A protein has these predicted regions:
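N-terminal loops that bind phosphate or other acidic moieties
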Residues: 1-320
Length: 320
């Protein structure tokens, strides 16, 4: 049997399919192209795909996703508040189009009106959140699907998701946030995975529109979404004895891939000396960029080739 791991995400790409269904289509194509293939499907990514990826891990933690199109993160905060006391709560978030700086999340977490976490009330609200999380004993984790911080020149308040600079800056708000988040958490029991210091300037603190910063300031942790899924899904174990990794990704373009989980998949494959083929609608990567991202081949559907046919062609090329 030739073991083929089909992993990644297909959110928003054409054909419009849930990631699990898209991976199944590719897997069926692999079987059509290689009769002795054994496809293993592994949803792996942010947003809707994250929900699919952690479906089998819900006994290990509670999971909350912050959609990137919401204007308020309050609902996510309320859901976390309801889950406090459990051993682990994970909040996934990416680069929101309209970041609320996590203030809605903070209000929802505390169960108070939005006005009670804004302006001069913010420092006291952050202190209450830290005390609440500490008393619960919960390991509160932000799965950051964007590396961008909440504050700074490369932050979610300075750059739109499409990488367009945001010219209208609310300097009063950024000043307030800079001061309120300084020297937090007060207990300093938290370590941000890639940075220590100001929690609103660290890696992924802009995730979920600023939810990452609130979690970090409350004594929680920020980890890249890819690293979290790698651990939860025991990615290395899934790749053992595999012959090929096919990674589904809607578009292979360097600016977009900077916020993807592709590097987690290709790094794990490299540890097993596995060939990796990207399956995408379109790619603008040069040969050098493909190599930098750990891709040995790319198949573009260009919306004309079905995913099943893509899987068949990849299998016939790479599983000879």
């Amino acid at each position: 049997m030739r073991r083929v791991v089909v992993a990644g995400r297909w959110d928003g790409a054409r054909p419009l399919l849930p990631t699990g269904v898209a991976l199944e289509e590719i897997g069926q194509g692999v079987l059509a192209g290689c009769a002795d293939a054994e496809p293993v499907l592994l949803p792996f990514g942010a947003g809707p795909t994250f929900d699919e990826a952690v479906a089998a891990s819900r006994s290990q933690a509670s999971f909350v996703c912050v959609p990137t199109d919401v204007a308020s993160t309050r609902e996510a905060g309320e859901r976390v508040a309801a889950a406090l006391g459990e051993s682990r709560v994970v909040v996934e978030g990416g680069h929101n189009a309209s970041p609320d700086c996590g203030l809605g999340f903070l209000a929802g977490l505390l169960g108070v009106a939005d006005s009670e976490v804004s302006g001069d009330a913010l420092p006291a609200a952050l202190t209450r959140a830290e005390e609440l999380v500490a008393a619960s004993g919960t390991d509160l984790v932000c799965a950051a699907s964007t590396p961008r911080p909440l504050l700074g020149l490369d932050s979610v308040l300075a750059i739109d998701p499409d990488l367009t600079p945001i010219e209208a800056q609310n300097t009063a708000l950024t000043g307030l946030l800079t001061q309120a988040f300084a020297h937090r958490p007060l207990g300093r029991r938290q370590l941000i995975e890639s940075s220590i210091g100001h929690p609103a300037r660290g890696y992924g603190s802009g995730a979920g529109g600023g939810v990452g910063a609130i979690i970090a300031a409350s004594g929680g942790r920020i980890v890249p979404t890819g690293a979290l899924l790698d651990d939860l899904l025991t990615l290395n174990k899934a790749l053992q004895s595999a012959d090929l990794l096919i990674v589904a990704e809607p578009e292979l373009a360097s600016p977009l891939l900077a916020t993807s989980t592709l590097d987690s998949l290709t790094s794990a494959a490299a540890a097993h000396a596995l060939p990796v083929v990207g399956c995408t609608v379109r790619s603008s990567l040069s040969h050098v960029e493909r190599a930098e991202w750990g891709l040995h081949g790319v198949f573009e559907t260009e919306t004309r080739v079905t995913l099943r046919e893509a899987g068949r062609r990849i299998a016939r090329t790479w599983l000879r």
